[in-house]
Every structure is written in C-alpha cells, then in structure tokens.
C-alpha cells in the first residue's frame, strides 16, 4: 500500500481537495486502484449537525455517513463510493480511544495523545485504506490522504505527529508528502512572493515531515526564478516544485499536474507498477475541459434556496447541474435567489431586492428548489414553485423542494388551504408532510433517514423512469426527517400530480410528476450526491434538457443509446446518434 499525504499551508481553502482528487485521477488513469481519506481536525463526530454557513454542504455517502464536502470531490473525480470511515475527525478518534479506555483495553495505563491518539489515527488510516471503493472488491493500491486546515493549527497537531511516526512505519518507498502552499502576487508590486511558502515548509519540516512535492497555488503561472527560489529555500529539487494557477475549470487541474511530470516522479519515488499510461481517462478529462471553454449556448437555472450567501452550501447541486449542462453542450448560468427575497416582507423592507429576485426568476429557463430545514424562506419557495407550475417552466424539487411542491399543489389545486408540514406547524389541521415514525426528536445528530435507499417506479408512463433508462427501480441517497403523509395520498387520486415512485414497502412517496407540464418533478432523495462528470444525474439532466427544449428529442434517442456514460462531443445540442461519443471510464 502506498500513502500520499496532502497538507496545506498559509491559508485554508487553498484547493487541497481538488489537488488531492486530481492526483488520484492521474494515478487512476495509469491503471492503479485509488482510495481517499479526508481528515478534519474538528471535535464534531461528523458534519451532520453543521450549519451550512460553517462548512458548506453536508455530503451524504451510500452508507449514510454525513461528511465533509471534499469527499464529494473525491467521489466525482475518481468515480468511487466512499464510506463514513473515510472521513476522520478529531471527535471520532477521541470517541474511539475513550471507548477503548472505558472497556479497559489499555489495562490501566495513562491514556495520552502520544502514543494512544496517534496510534489510533495510524491504525484507522491503515485499516480504511484497504477497503475497496470502486465496486470490484479489489484492495486499493494507493491511498490519498488530505489533512484539513493548515500546518501549525493547534487542532491538527496530533495528526501531524501521527504521520511523522507513520512515515517510518510505512517506510519511505511507501509514503509521499505533497504540500500545497500559496504564492501571493500583491497588486501593488505584481511580484510573486515566496516567503509564505518558505515559512510554511519550514513549519512542516520543524514538525518532522519533509515535502516530496510542493504545489504552488497562484493566480498566474509562477516564473522559473520563483520556482528555483522555492527549491533552494525549501530543500527540494526544482522539478519537485510545480504550479497550479487559476484555471477556467477544475477539469484542467489533473491535466496541469500531468503536464508537469508528476506521473514520472510518482513512479520513481514510490516504485509504482506503471507500465503504460495509455488509459483514456485523462483524454476524457481533456475533452471535457476543452468543451467547457468553447461552450456558447447558455441555459439559465434559478436556484431558490435559503443558504445562497455561501456557494459551498449547494456545492453538489451546482456540480450536478454543471455535469448535465456540459453533457448537452450548454454553458450553465446558475442564478442564486434567496427565497426570502421573493416574499412580501422583502417587498416592504427592500423593494429593489424584491424586484431583482423576481426578475431573475422570470428570466430563468428552469427552476430548482433544493433541500433545506426550517420555516424561514418557505413562502418564497412556495411562490417560486407556483410560478413554475402555472407558467409551465421546467422545475425540479429536491427533498424539501418536493414536499413544498406537494403542499403548493394541495393548497392551490385541491383547495386544501391549510395543508402544511408539521415541521413548520406541528398543529396544522392538514398535516400533508409529517415527521417519520423512526425519527427521535431528542437528538439531531444521526437521526435522519440517511444513505442509499431503493425507490420503485409505480408506473411505466414516467419521464424520470425513461431518463433513468426504463429500469424498474433506482437507488439514490437520502437525507431527511420528514415525508409526505401516506394517509393523505388518496386526496391526489385522479389529479394531475402523480406519485410515480415509492420505497420498497410502498409506504413512502419518493417521486412526483405533474402531467401536462413540460417537466415538473420532485424527488425525496438527493440525486446530486451521485452525479459524476461523465455520468450526469438523470433528474438534473432532465431539468437541463427541458430548460433547453430538447427533452423530447433526447427521450426518443434513449431507446437507441446506452444511457450510462453517454457523453456528447458535438458542438451543438443536436442529439443525433452519430454525434454521441461513448466515454466509458471503466
């Protein structure tokens, strides 16, 4: 087993996750089996109870793990399915050690950070690195480990010490350290500064780790003189200093790394079994990156949500939309609308903001209402849903978005004016959305319906069923505490809003579709978590197809084409069979 540790310096949010994912992509393109581990040095057990404004979205895994959004990058780049234990937190490690101490596993010894915490970290990494993540049940050959935060943070000291020890346990030929640092370029001078990187590497070396590769993040390509200066002061060869400057899309990052010879250096330093890197995975990434830059037709989607001030709150939603837009040769114009800005209260307090929000909504080719929690902003979401339904604008509701679509239809089409969710009004006379029976209202952490669940289609006449390839059932990831009340489903009989997907027991409503509408779909699950750059999520793809007026054409072609891994390389949005390029990443 080979271990690649990715650390960061100077500032957080420098792009370690994308760089680590790109490293994994390059190695996978060489025929190697790659897994990934993300270390978050916070004391929380997992990311499940975080505010979206703290760390962005909570990414959900197949096994129900609520983890850092960087694991989403790993899954998308590497096309793998990780587990909750691939996300290590300080809280998990301490909980594990304390539980062992309570059981008496330490035989009365004084439990300390060194060696007990550091040993637990090393054992966790070694055990999880062996777990197969790509479906073929073969053990991974390489584990890419990202250490969150920056070198020098007090929260991460135990992890740095653990890896200082681990490099000797694993042996030099099996352990590799990549340090990602910032090379700022002040506008006043325009000169690229190396001092922050020098200090960061000095701090890293002072803690017992020496970088094998220094990745310099910069706004523009770094000059050779700057690279040589970093090489001299950081005790590495010039070829061990590479640059990742700002690029048009993240699809360029693996290509930048490959162009600078990292494969050859990995092969020599880690003695990797690489004979021929002719795998066409990187070629596909280049195809995607090139196409991304030449897209001209634009598709505008309005995202009506509660957490629009921080884009990372909807990171996977954005990626799923981007994957779908790229697949149909359109540039995505995602317009973020704070749902509360659509409400009358904003009209009274800030008319300009109110009219700007409604102008965005009116200009949108499609409308998306994602998941969320709490009553704030729900009126604005209901108004956006009503607009999409009545104006026949393509609409996709995710989780809460689906629940609100059912409520909006009940209020305005079934004359159930008091229809509501018990999340917003526990005493509502028409509880159309209710708390699930298994939900424990005492604690918030880990009390939701989480992870991969099966949804069975109940009709053959379903747009979404066709988009999924006419399969009898699908499996998607869930994260919710509330569900449509099964006792009130009879109210919708013979109405235009149809429940076309249910759970395996036929008790939970999973998918809704509105007949007579170009595309009005709601899903209780979160399909964005399963979207991949070369395998766009069907519900999101359907939204983009409907928004560009090509849904019917695409559905007609579905009988002739294999849905999985279809990737068009056409310069327009025509869906003729001859213009589809099959990009099989296996």
Swiss-Prot record:
Gene Ontology cellular-component annotations: cytoophidium; cytoplasm
Residues annotated with Phosphoserine modification: 568, 571, 574
Keywords associated with the record: ATP-binding, Glutamine amidotransferase, Ligase, Nucleotide-binding, Phosphoprotein, Pyrimidine biosynthesis
Domain Glutamine amidotransferase type-1: 300-554
First and last residue of the signal peptide: none
GO MF annotations, alphabetized: ATP binding; CTP synthase activity; identical protein binding
Record function comment: Catalyzes the ATP-dependent amination of UTP to CTP with either L-glutamine or ammonia as the source of nitrogen. Constitutes the rate-limiting enzyme in the synthesis of cytosine nucleotides.
Alphabetical GO biological process terms: 'de novo' CTP biosynthetic process; CTP biosynthetic process; pyrimidine nucleobase biosynthetic process
Protein family (similarity comment): Belongs to the CTP synthase family.
Reaction(s) catalysed by this chain's protein: UTP + L-glutamine + ATP + H2O = CTP + L-glutamate + ADP + phosphate + 2 H(+)
Family annotation (PANTHER family): CTP SYNTHASE, CTP SYNTHASE 2
UniProt lineage: Eukaryota, Metazoa, Chordata, Craniata, Vertebrata
Active-site residues annotated for this sequence: 399 (for gatase activity), 526 (for gatase activity), 528 (for gatase activity)
Transferase keyword on record: no
Enzyme Commission numbers on file: 6.3.4.2
Pathway: Pyrimidine metabolism; CTP biosynthesis via de novo pathway; CTP from UDP: step 2/2
Annotated source species: Rattus norvegicus
Domain of life: Eukaryota
Positions of disulphide bridges: none
Protein name in UniProt: CTP synthase 2
């Amino acid at each position: 087993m080979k271990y690649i540790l990715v650390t960061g310096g100077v500032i957080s949010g420098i792009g370690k996750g994308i760089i680590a994912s790109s490293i994994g992509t390059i190695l996978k393109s060489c025929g190697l089996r790659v897994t990934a581990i993300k270390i978050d040095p916070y004391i929380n057990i997992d990311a499940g109870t975080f505010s979206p404004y703290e760390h962005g979205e909570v990414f959900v895994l197949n096994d129900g793990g609520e983890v850092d959004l960087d694991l989403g990058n790993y899954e998308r780049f590497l096309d793998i399915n990780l587990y909750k234990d691939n996300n290590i937190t300080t809280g998990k490690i301490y909980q594990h050690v304390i539980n062992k101490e309570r059981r008496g596993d330490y035989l009365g010894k004084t439990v300390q950070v060194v060696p007990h915490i550091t040993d637990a970290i090393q054992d966790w990494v070694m055990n999880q690195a062996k777990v197969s993540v790509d479906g073929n049940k073969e053990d991974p050959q390489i584990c890419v480990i990202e250490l969150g935060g920056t070198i020098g943070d007090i929260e991460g000291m135990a992890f740095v010490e653990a890896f200082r020890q681990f490099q000797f346990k694993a042996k030099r030929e099996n352990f590799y350290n990549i340090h990602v640092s910032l090379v700022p370029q002040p506008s006043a001078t325009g000169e690229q500064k190396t001092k922050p990187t020098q200090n960061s590497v000095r701090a890293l070396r002072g803690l017992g780790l020496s970088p094998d590769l220094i990745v310099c993040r910069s706004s523009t390509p770094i000059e050779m003189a700057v690279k040589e200066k970093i090489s001299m002061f950081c005790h590495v060869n010039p070829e061990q200093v590479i640059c990742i400057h700002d690029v048009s899309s993240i699809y360029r990052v693996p290509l930048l790394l490959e162009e600078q010879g990292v494969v050859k250096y990995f092969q020599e330093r880690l003695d990797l079994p690489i004979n021929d890197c002719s795998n066409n995975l990187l070629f596909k990434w280049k195809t995607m990156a090139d196409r991304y830059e030449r897209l001209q037709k634009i598709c505008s989607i309005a995202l009506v949500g509660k957490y629009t001030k921080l884009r990372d709150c909807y990171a996977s939603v954005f990626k799923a939309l981007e994957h779908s837009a790229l697949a149909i040769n359109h540039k995505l114009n995602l317009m973020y609308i704070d749902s509360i800005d659509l409400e009358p209260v904003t009209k009274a307090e800030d008319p300009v903001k109110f009219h700007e929000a409604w102008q965005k909504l009116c200009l949108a080719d499609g409308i998306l209402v994602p998941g969320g929690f709490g009553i704030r902003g729900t009126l604005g979401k209901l108004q956006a849903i009503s607009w999409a339904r009545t104006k026949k604008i393509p609409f996709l509701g995710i989780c809460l978005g689906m629940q609100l679509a059912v409520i909006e239809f009940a209020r305005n089409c079934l004359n159930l004016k008091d229809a509501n969710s018990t999340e917003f009004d526990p005493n509502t006379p028409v509880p159309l959305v209710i708390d699930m029976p298994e939900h424990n209202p005492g604690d918030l952490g880990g009390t939701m319906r989480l992870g991969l669940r099966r949804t069975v289609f109940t009709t053959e006449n379903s747009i979404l069923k066709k988009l999924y390839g006419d399969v009898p059932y699908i499996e998607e990831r869930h994260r919710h505490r509330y569900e449509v009340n099964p006792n009130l489903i009879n109210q919708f009989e013979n109405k235009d809003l149809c429940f076309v997907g249910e759970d395996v027991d036929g008790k939970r409503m999973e998918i809704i579709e509105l007949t007579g509408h170009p595309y009005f779909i709601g899903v209780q699950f979160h399909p964005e978590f399963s979207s991949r750059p070369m395998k766009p999520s069907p519900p999101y793809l359907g939204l983009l197809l409907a928004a560009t007026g090509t849904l019917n054409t695409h559905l007609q072609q579905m009988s002739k084409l294999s849905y999985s891994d279809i990737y068009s390389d056409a310069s327009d949005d025509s869906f003729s069979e001859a213009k589809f390029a099959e990009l099989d990443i296996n």
